[in-house]
Regions:
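Conserved glycine-rich cofactor-binding loop
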Residues: 15-16
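C-terminal substrate-recognition "lid" of short-chain dehydrogenase/reductases
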Residues: 214-242, 247-248
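Active-site helix of classical SDR
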Residues: 125, 161, 169
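Alpha-helical segment proximal to the catalytic Tyr-Lys
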Residues: 130, 173-178
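Substrate-binding pocket helix/loop in short-chain dehydrogenase/reductase
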Residues: 98-111, 206
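Residue(s) in the substrate-gating loop at a strand-loop-helix junction
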Residues: 145
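Short, small/polar-rich loop/turn modules that mediate ligand/substrate recognition or access, typified
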Residues: 177-181, 235-237
Length: 250
């Protein structure tokens, strides 16, 4: 894997499990990492920063539901750290709703899910793209989900938002080329607290239904993000599935 010395990586959703794992791998390869999260409580952020190799890493406050905050933080990061080479959109939100329970998927929940999981991704790209065009070989990585093409997952709105994210990845890869690459990553079940109520019992059932007989870990996703950033440098407009084969049997 290529080194990332001299590169600046921004991770939206930097205090989430996948964001943290990705930050650690980027830092281990020499990048300086800017982690963006809606809350930067030192009790939460300082241990994360302390776990990163190297120096120059920082936490910033912004919300993907507040475009002005994203514009401000993009300018602040460039001012503090210089040109931005890597943007990872890993912020997300969901809530379990059975696919056949139409009444439980309220208008308010649908709006919240699309606001975070689709509009928030676009708003981040819109805010950071002007600052990335000044960098060498910049790349945007959108964290999606196999729910986008299996129709399964925590709820229908989440699956639809992720399908929209995959389309966004393709469309912006064309629109922003050749200056920027835009790629995606589609995990399946990952051993995190992202989906409320899905604990060890759920993971065990999911593992038994996965060809590789385990659920993913945050590091599995982070390693794929690193690969898309480094060794897969000729890829753009594509979304890489990293799910242990789960989509084959869903």
């Amino acid at each position: 894997i290529s080194r990332l010395d001299g590169k600046v990586a921004v991770i939206i959703g930097g205090a989430g499990a996948i964001g943290i794992a990705t930050a650690r791998q980027f830092a281990a390869l020499g990048a300086r990492v800017a982690l963006v999260h809606r809350s930067t409580d030192p009790a939460r952020t300082q241990p994360i920063l302390a776990s990163l190799q190297g120096s120059g890493h920082q936490f910033y406050t912004a919300s993907v539901t507040d475009s002005a905050s994203l514009n401000n933080v993009a300018a602040q990061i460039q001012n503090d750290m210089g040109a931005i080479h890597i943007l990872v959109n890993s912020a997300g939100f969901t809530q379990p709703v059975p696919l056949n329970d139409l009444e439980a998927l309220s208008d308010e929940l649908i709006d919240s899910i699309f606001q975070v999981n689709w509009r928030g991704v676009f708003a981040s790209i819109r805010a950071f793209t002007p600052h990335m065009k000044k960098a060498q070989d910049p790349v945007i990585i959108n964290v999606s989900s196999i729910a986008a093409f299996t129709g399964m997952g925590s709820n229908l709105a989440y699956a639809a938002a992720k399908a929209g994210t995959d389309l966004m990845t393709k469309a912006l890869a064309k629109a922003l080329s050749p200056e920027l690459r835009v790629v995606g990553i589609s995990p399946g079940v990952v051993n995190t607290s992202f989906v409320p109520g899905c604990g060890p019992e759920f993971n065990q059932k999911a593992a038994s239904a996965t060809p590789l007989r385990r659920v993913g870990e945050s590091d599995d996703v982070a390693q794929a993000i690193v690969a898309l950033t480094t060794t897969l440098a000729f890829a753009t407009g594509t979304t890489l599935v990293v799910d242990g084969g789960r989509h084959l049997v869903s």
